[in-house]
Structures are given as structure tokens and as C-alpha cells.
Swiss-Prot record:
The keyword Repeat belongs to this UniProt entry's keyword annotation: yes
UniProt keyword annotation of Membrane present: no
Organism per entry: Bos taurus (Bovine)
Start and stop residues of the MORN repeats: 15-37, 38-60
Name the record gives this protein: MORN repeat-containing protein 2
Disulfide bonds: none
């Protein structure tokens, strides 16, 4: 698949965004089965670059993601 699309996994996970060669690639949103969500850049099925992670409590974390690491994340406060 290439271009924009939506993939729903039987686990409840959902990816909506850009695909390249059947992989998450470019901007997209991945919603985890527990309701947490990552919105940002993907590179060959991996989170890569600027993005935002919203945890199950609704807290929003912004920063630079690199596969399983996210050094220097910032908590976004709504006042």
C-alpha cells in the first residue's frame, strides 16, 4: 500500500496516516489498544521525529521520538 490509509488490527490498535511500501511512513496517528495515542512522523513502521504522545490519563507529551527512545519529552500543560 502507498498513500494515505487506515489499518485496524484485531488487537484494537489503529493506524491512520501515510504508507509507503506497506509500512507506516510519513505523518500518521497510531492509537494503542489501551487508548493511548501517538501522532507524528513514522519511518518504516517506527516512530521517528517530531511527535506527540497522549497517555491513557490524557496527558500530552511532545518532543522528538526515535523508535523506542524519546529523549527530552516535554509535558504539554493546558492552563
Amino acid at each position: 500500500m502507498n498513500g494515505f490509509g487506515r489499518l485496524e488490527h484485531f488487537s484494537g490498535a489503529i493506524y491512520e496516516g501515510h504508507f509507503k511500501d506497506n509500512m507506516f511512513h510519513g505523518l500518521g496517528t497510531y492509537t494503542f489498544p489501551n487508548g493511548a495515542k501517538y501522532t507524528g512522523n513514522f519511518n518504516e513502521n517506527r516512530v521517528e521525529g517530531e511527535g506527540q504522545y497522549t497517555d491513557i490519563q490524557g496527558l500530552e507529551w511532545c518532543g522528538n521520538f526515535h523508535f523506542t527512545a524519546a529523549p527530552g519529552l516535554r509535558l504539554k500543560l493546558h492552563m
